[in-house]
Each structure stands twice: as C-alpha cells, then as structure tokens.
Amino acid sequence: MITIKKGLDLPIAGTPSQVISDGKAIKKVALLGEEYVGMRPTMHVRVGDEVKKAQILFEDKKNPGVKFTSPVSGKVVEINRGAKRVLQSVVIEVAGDDQVTFDKFEANQLASLNRDAIKTQLVESGLWTAFRTRPFSKVPAIDSTSEAIFVTAMDTNPLAAEPTVVINEQSEAFVAGLDVLSALTTGKVYVCKKGTSLPRSQQPNVEEHVFDGPHPAGLAGTHMHFLYPVSADHVAWSINYQDVIAVGQLFLTGELYTQRVVSLAGPVVNKPRLVRTVMGASLEQLVDSEIMPGEVRIISGSVLSGTKATGPHAYLGRYHLQVSVLREGRDKELFGWAMPGKNKFSVTRSFLGHLFKGQVYNMTTTTNGSDRSMVPIGNYEKVMPLDMEPTLLLRDLCAGDSDSAVRLGALELDEEDLALCTFVCPGKYEYGQLLRECLDKIEKEG
C-alpha cells in the first residue's frame, strides 16, 4: 500500500448516495472537440447527416488514423466552431438504434489476441481515444506502444462516485477489459485502487496497487509518480475504469458500449446520487428538475478541475465521470475576511469553521477576492504529495520558463494534478491553464 499524507479532501456539501438510478431520457449528445489536446479534425459528416452508433464523425489530422465515433444513433444537428474555426462540439439528436458492429470474442480468447487486431478494433470503434499519454495528456498515436498502462479504479475527487459500485455491476466486462489491455501493452497494466476488493484479471502482467490518503491519491498522475515516473523518453498511458468496462464490452459483444454512470451531486442538487446516462449527454437535459431554484453553474467533471457546461459545451465530457452543480457566488460580503466564519472553510484555518470536525460547506463559485500576486505561504506544499518543489514549479509556470519547469517535473503533470494548488492559491492563479501553455510550448520546441 502507498499512503499519501499530503493533499485535501474538500468538505463540500451534496455528497451523492452510492446507489445507481436511471437518469433522465437524453435527446441530444455531443462530442467536444476541445477536450482532445492538439486535435485538428477532418470532418466526415455535416449538419443533417444521419449517423449510426460507432460511425466515424471526424479524424485527427495531426494524429493520423485516430477516429472519433458517434456514441448514439441519430442525426447531426449542430457542428459548433469557435475562434480560428476550432471545433467546439458535434451535436447529435438521438434517434433509432442502428449501429456499426465489430468482431466479438470469447472471454478466454482475449488475453491471446494479436496486438494489431486489438488496436484495429479499438481505433475503428473510437475507443482508442479513451487512452491518454503522459507526458502531454494526448490520445496516443496508433503506431505507438506503451510499457505501462494505468487503470484508475479509484476516485478521490470531491463528490465522486465509488468505482466499486460501478465495477461490481460489470465485473465480467471489467476483467475482459483488463485482459485486452494486458495483450495490448508490452509491459504491465497497473490497476490502482483503494483497499476494497475488485474483480481480478489472471494475467501475469496485470498488477493491483493500493493507494490510500486524501485527494489527489486517486489521480493517474499520482499513481505514475510512485510506480512508473514518466519523462520525455518514458511514456505511460492512462484509462479510467468505466472505459475499461467499455473495452471489455466491445470485445465480448462486438458493440460499442457508451453507457456512463456519473455522480450528479453538489450543494444545490435536490437528490445527489449516481445516475446512468450516455457518453456526451446533454447536461441541461440530465439535470432538468434536479437542482434548486436560483442561478447555478453546471460543471462537467470535478468542482476542482471540471469545465463549465454552457452553450456548445453543455455536454458530458469524454473523460468525466461526474456532474457537479454549484450556486453562482454573486453576493459580496463586506469585510468577510474579518468575520469569525463558522460556516466558512479555509485551508489556513483563518475561520472558526476548522474547529467543527466533519462539517461540510455549501460552497459556491466565488473566489473570495480578486486576482493578486502569487504569495508562497506554504499552501502548495500542504496539498502536493508528489516529490517536487511546487512553489518553484508554479513560479516558473507563471513566468513561462519551460526549461526550468521541465527540470522541476512539469512533464509528469496534467491540469488535474494542479487543481488543488489553484484552489489553495491566495493569488487566484489558474495553474492548470498555465501548465497546458507550458506543455504546448515544450512539445512545439521538441
């Protein structure tokens, strides 16, 4: 067991009950183009086209051969683009149940499948995009291999679903997915979990590792740091547990599995719980009649590192397993910093709230102050469990010094790994965005 002592479990109200129920009927789904780092699409459909489930929608010009497929059968009703013609979303109106089918196999055949056959089926179905590389957090090239695939079978994000609830419901598919991954990699498959028991693959290169401690103990970046540190020449892939289930279903049934179980939770959700929906679901439809009156912000993903779901982005993200809802923090408080703060949370224990153990808070979107200078008062060190100097690294990200950032470990990180640093920052810096700018610069310069 690897125990993490540094970190932070955010005491936010609205924890979901760990029981799965069916979500609202979804009439629109979308693929969000900006989720895929560096992707430039070659479109295969236009508005008005009828598409089958698992039919190709677009390919990546910069990563030849990588295909992005439809999660449902229906009609393309919107192709939204932003500045410089960046693809924002391809929206599909759900209709019918036509689908593209693939080869299917018996469970005892999966571990002995040819690696090229596995790649072909994953690419053609669109499930290849479930993998993300470190460094850079991109979809891997289809001619690449990895000596380490990390399966995140735990989730320490605030308000997250408990993975064992989902995995135990799909245990056969989960094991089948692990068997496929074991044949895909030239090295090991690391299944990272809490201390709970999970269905196990019998393949010798599939290892289970237990992590314990506060968030970010459940992030792929944390697991890689301790088990297989990455660098420019040392690449690892990660995949979440629900995509492992989808891989298993694809090879067992020959059909693309796009069902998602997400946590619908937060301080303004009427009944926080786990809901069954579809990948790319319209979040406006999913949360309909589920939230309290007033101005709220719907977030695809974690409250720490998710994205605001509005307009052309108002859909469930490809890599997101939760939908968080917070009240917009529009109200200003005169001299709020000077008040006792019984119902306020502070990492630095500035308020009385820290005296009440186990208290949860109705947090909002307010940042409690305006932007200011970066102030190194030890907050970053409290929440960074990785063996690196966070204050120095974050300073270099602010200054745009990519050479120094690489020396300090920037290549190991993804935006989600710095989300807690953003949360505890007195200067209100968005370190995830600064990290992405730095990684883009490093990759461009080679």
From Swiss-Prot:
Belongs to the NqrA family. Keywords: Ion transport, NAD, Sodium, Sodium transport, Translocase, Transport, Ubiquinone. NQR complex catalyzes the reduction of ubiquinone-1 to ubiquinol by two successive reactions, coupled with the transport of Na(+) ions from the cytoplasm to the periplasm. NqrA to NqrE are probably involved in the second step, the conversion of ubisemiquinone to ubiquinol. Its EC number is 7.2.1.1. NCBIfam families: nqrA, PRK05352.1-2. Composed of six subunits; NqrA, NqrB, NqrC, NqrD, NqrE and NqrF. It catalyses: a ubiquinone + n Na(+)(in) + NADH + H(+) = a ubiquinol + n Na(+)(out) + NAD(+). Transmembrane segments: none annotated. GO terms for molecular function: oxidoreductase activity, acting on NAD(P)H, quinone or similar compound as acceptor. Signal peptide: none annotated. Coiled coil: none annotated. GO terms for biological process: sodium ion transport. This is Na(+)-translocating NADH-quinone reductase subunit A. It is an enzyme of class 7 (translocase). It comes from the Bacteria.
